[in-house]
Each structure stands twice: as C-alpha cells, then as structure tokens.
Swiss-Prot record:
The VCR (vertebrate conserved) regions bind the first hairpin of MAT2A mRNAs. The VCR regions interact with the internal stem-loop within U6 snRNAs, inducing the conformational rearrangement of the A43-containing region of U6 snRNA, thereby modifying the RNA structure to become suitable for productive catalysis by the methyltransferase region. Residues 402-413 have a biased composition (Basic and acidic residues). Residues 163-167 are annotated as: K-loop. This is RNA N(6)-adenosine-methyltransferase METTL16. Its EC number is 2.1.1.348, 2.1.1.346. Its main location: nucleus. S-adenosyl-L-methionine binds at R82, G110, S114, E133, T164, N184. Changing K14A: Does not affect methyltransferase activity. GO terms for biological process: mRNA catabolic process; mRNA destabilization; mRNA processing; negative regulation of 3'-UTR-mediated mRNA stabilization; post-transcriptional regulation of gene expression; regulation of mRNA splicing, via spliceosome; rRNA base methylation; S-adenosylmethionine biosynthetic process. The modification Phosphoserine is found at S329. Pfam families: Methyltransf_10. It catalyses: adenosine in U6 snRNA + S-adenosyl-L-methionine = N(6)-methyladenosine in U6 snRNA + S-adenosyl-L-homocysteine + H(+); an adenosine in mRNA + S-adenosyl-L-methionine = an N(6)-methyladenosine in mRNA + S-adenosyl-L-homocysteine + H(+). Changing K47E: Reduced methyltransferase activity.
Length: 562
C-alpha cells in the first residue's frame, strides 16, 4: 500500500510525485531506463540498480540543482525518504521559526558515497555539515560530490577509523556546539538478516527495490540496535555538545528498546517519528539534554486506511408519510406533507429526547438538521419504563390462600392485628396494597395495574426493538453495516470510558460535554423520503446508531398506532 500521503507535510513529493514521462523527455540518461506499456504509462524497474541510480541523480538535478555520481557497489539513496529526514530535523531545531541567517551546524554519521544529507541540508537551508565516513570508496565519492557542487565551504567530509561514531570525530573541534546529528545506521547484523531469511515476515511480499549497499553500509555488529546504542552512550559523554541527537531506523522493533535505553539513562527529552514514502516506512528517534528545546510531538497512532464512511440511512415510504401527515395536524397550523412532515416528526422526537437541534442550509428538496446530543436520553426512556414496571411488580400483595380464606369467613375481633389489616374491605385499603397512614405518599405514581396487566408485564425484558435501540446494531439498510468506529472507538473507550456502558452519563474531560454531533438530511427520493444521518464528531459512533434506530422505530410506531 502506497504511503506517499503520509509523507512529511513539507516534502515536495507528497502531493506531486515524480513525473517519469517528463523526466524521460528532458534527461536522456534517465530515458533509457524507463518502460512504456501499451496504455502509454511510463514505469521504472526498481530492481535494476542502474535505473534506481538514474532516478536519484535525475531528481537531484531537476529539483535541487545537484549533480552527483554514485557507484553501483554502494548504497543508492532514495530522494523522498532523505528529504523526509531533513524536514524532520528542521522541526527539531525549529528552523522554520528561527532566523534563517543563523548558521546551523550538523553532523552526518556515515555520510555514504552520495553525501546526500549534507548536500540537501546545505542546498535547502545553508547548513554547515561535518560528514564522517569509514569506507574508502564512499569517502572519495562523497568528497567529489561536494566539490563538484561547490559546497566545500559548507560541507567537510572526514575519513574516520572503523567503529568511530561521535567521540573521536569531535576530538579536534572541542569548542563547537552542533545543533544536530543525523545517522542512517547499518540495519542488519549479518548476511541472513540482510537477506530477510530470519528477520522478514514470510507473509510480506518481497522488496520492490534492489539493495546495493556495501558491507559497512548495511551491516554492523549487533545490527542497528547496537549501533544506535553506541551513539546513545557517546551522547551521554558529549551531552550538550549537540542540541539534538537523531538516528533513522529500518525496523520498528528497534524503536521500543532504544526508547527504553534512553529512559534508563535518564535522558530528559525524547521523541520519534515515522518516515513514509512509496511502499517504504522508516522510523527515527531523537533525544536531547537541553531543557529549552521544543520537542515535536510523535505521530499519532495511525489507523487503517478506510473508505469514506457512508451515512446511516432508512427510508420512509410514501404511504407512511401520508399517515404521518394526518397525525401531524395538531403539531402544525398548516398542512405538512412529504419530507417536511418527516422532518417535523423527527424534530418532535428530538425535542422529547432533549437533543439539541437546529435547521441548517441545504439543497433543494432536502431538509438538514444539525444535532448535538448531550446525554443518552433515548436509552433513559426505555430504562425508566422498565424500572416503573419492576416497581409495580414489587408492590406487596396478600398471598392467594389468605385472600381466599378471608372471603370465606369474616375475621373475629380476637384475630391478630396483622389479620385485621388483611381483612379490611376494599374501601379501607389502597388499590395497590396496604392502607397508607396519614401523611404517607404512594411509592408509585399513576394508576395501579390490574392483575391481568401485571401478569402481562411479568417479564419486563426489552423488546427486540428496544434491544436494537440500546445496542445500536440494527441494520438500517445495508449502509449501517460496518459503521462502528473500530479501533477509534476502542481507543476512545479506553480514554474516556465506554459511553454505552455509562448509559448516557456525561463523560468528564470532554470539550463542551457532549456525546456526539451529527447531521440529519431528509431527502426526497421519488415518492419516498430518505433519512440520512452523517457522523460529525464525538465519543462513540455507536451512540448515533442507537439514536437513528430509535427515531426510525418511533416514526414507524406512529403509523402502527391507530
């Protein structure tokens, strides 16, 4: 799945990927590597190292005015990924908000043959770089690339011994404070890991591009995890010699143990990010010992890419609208028909539920309502009804055998007070049980049910419709299917507690203290009316499902009741 839409916001390739056809028409060296299919679509074989090298060199020349040479035996960098890293470093050091005339100093650990990070940083931002390299071939190519782009005054390439990271590289420049360091460490610990034999999930497809890196570029003792730990240990000695330390990671599983290492070492400022481009994802970790640095927020938890959510809908047939129009006469002075009468009844239901709503502008033959639900009142109504029935069931009654015995004989004055109480006539007892003393209030308001009605309410469990309103799971047409928020809802539940479990309580800590906001559209569809409910924002989409089901059931019950 392409990840280009998740690139850094300032990455020039985020919304405008390279135009291979245009580049091929302008650069003959690139043209020889492109392929054109029968539909005229231009493509590139990313498994061909020469094609990948041609693309990198062409993009640097076209978009940045840089001319470089890269040997096929060494790592060929992809431009969008490296540009993502440069932009993140800009965020770390506050480049966008700072005085552009201030000279920024950075270190590139293992700059590679292309020397791409210093070239991009110097060209885009005028940064000064100390670029280190252990490999002879990479060192020679890096120096050549710097010189042929006339950037020797901003980029210093130095050859360092094997396993040299920061400590030895900074011995000669003990007075300079650097703003940052960058590093693209060797990802793998051995050949098997580099080939994905013991590290790659077998379910993943094979890599779509070729790996051309040399031994020192792709492999190190202990892999990237141990390599970055060595940088961390160097930083513990250098501390404020650099404002920010950073490293790119090729494996997500390396991120957590490195963050834990920084925590154990007591590093005060830590952040991380994701680099997304094409079909490749990388991670980066940064830390600082300065108190005055601004720490960029890490990326929020990414959700699976989803199709746009369909609204929850149900249809009100023309025959139903006609019945609703007849019943709506007490509600309106003028006659209401069609979608107007459906909207009128929806507004009445919402008013009864105390759901805030107002009409908003919309298209022709359409009525729109904007809803703000403060509490889950549609569930409360059902709960109150069942609670009332339970209270009626629990009113004490005399046992049947006692009543029968009392009917057969009148009590004598010598009988116990309790028997006398039971023997009182109907005029001396309340209709619902024992007589009330003066000043006592009835426990249940309203008329008491008959024996028949009580037996009918013996099991006051929710009906199927009531369950559907509480559960929010009735499939109101097919568009309701799969409409729950999935991981988003689960996350919200973990943060605020489950809104459904709370049964309509206002959840603390929520701006405005509302459950959700949504938009109801009532549209004319031939002779019928289509009711759509669109999610806007809130705590849990299932609550909107419940309300939609409740409204639908109430409208249909209006017609069913004669």
């Amino acid at each position: 799945m392409a990840l280009s839409k998740s690139m850094h916001a300032r990455n020039r390739y985020k919304d405008k990927p390279p135009d291979f056809a245009y580049l091929a028409s302008k650069y003959p060296d690139f043209k020889q590597h492109v392929q054109i299919n029968l539909n005229g679509r231009v493509s590139l074989n990313f498994k061909d190292p020469e094609a990948v090298r041609a693309l990198t060199c062409t993009l640097l020349r076209e978009d940045f005015g840089l001319s470089i040479d890269i040997p096929l035996e060494r790592l060929i960098p992809t431009v969008p990924l490296r540009l993502n890293y440069i932009h993140w470093v800009e965020d770390l050091i506050g480049h966008q908000d700072s005085d552009k005339s201030t000279l920024r100093r950075g270190i590139d650990i293992g700059t590679g043959a292309s020397c791409i990070y210093p070239l991009l940083g110097a060209t885009l931002n005028g940064w000064y770089f100390l670029a280190t390299e252990v490999d002879d071939m990479c060192f020679n190519y890096a120096k050549k690339n710097v010189e042929q782009n006339n950037l020797s005054d901003l980029i210093k390439v130095v050859k360092v011994p094997q396993k040299t990271l920061l400590m030895d590289a900074l011995k000669e420049e003990s007075e300079i404070i650097y703003d940052f360091c960058m590093c693209n460490p060797p990802f793998f610990a051995n050949q098997l890991e580099a080939k994905g034999v013991n590290s790659r999930n077998p379910r993943r497809p094979p890599p779509s591009s070729v790996n051309t890196g040399g031994i020192t570029e792709i492999m190190a003792e202990g892999g990237e995890l141990e390599f970055v730990k060595r940088i961390i240990h160097d930083s513990l000695q250098l501390k404020k010699r650099l404002r920010w330390y950073s490293c790119m990671l090729g494996k997500k599983c390396s991120l957590a143990p490195l963050k834990e290492e920084l925590r154990i070492q007591g590093v005060p400022k830590v952040t991380y990010t994701e680099f997304c481009q094409g079909r490749t994802m990388r991670w980066a970790l940064a830390w600082s010992f300065y108190d005055d640095v601004t720490v960029p927020s890490p990326p929020s938890k990414r959700r699976k890419l989803e199709k746009p959510r369909k609204p929850i809908t149900f249809v009100v047939l023309a025959s139903v609208m006609k019945e609703l129009s007849l019943k709506a006469s007490p509600l309106r002075s003028e006659t209401a028909e069609g979608i107007v009468v459906v909207t009128t009844w929806i507004e009445k239901i919402l008013t009864d539920l105390k759901v805030q709503h107002k009409r908003v502008p919309c298209g022709k033959e359409e009525v729109s309502l904007f809803l703000t639900a403060i509490e889950n009142s549609w569930i409360h109504l059902r709960r109150k009804k069942r609670e009332r029935v339970r209270q009626l069931r629990e009113v004490p009654r005399a046992p049947e055998d006692v009543i029968q015995a009392l009917e057969e004989k009148k009590p004598t004055p010598k009988e116990s007070g309790n028997s006398q109480e039971l023997a009182r006539g109907p005029q001396e007892r309340t209709p619902c049980g024992p007589a009330l003393r003066e000043g006592e209030a009835a426990a249940v308001e309203g008329p008491c049910p008959s024996q028949e009605s009580l037996s009918q309410e013996e099991n006051p469990e929710p009906t199927e419709d009531e369950r559907s309103e509480e559960k929010g799971g009735v499939e109101v047409l097919e568009s309701c299917q799969g409409s729950s928020n999935g991981a988003q809802d689960q996350e919200a539940s973990e943060q605020f507690g489950s809104p459904v479990a709370e049964r309509g309580k206002r959840l603390p800590g929520v701006a405005g203290q509302y459950l959700f906001k949504c938009l109801i559209n009532v549209k004319k569809e031939v002779d019928d009316a289509l009711v759509e409910m669109h999610w806007v924002e809130g705590q849990n989409r299932d609550l909107m499902n419940q309300l939609c089901t409740y409204i639908r059931n109430q409208i249909f019950r209006l017609v069913a009741v004669n």
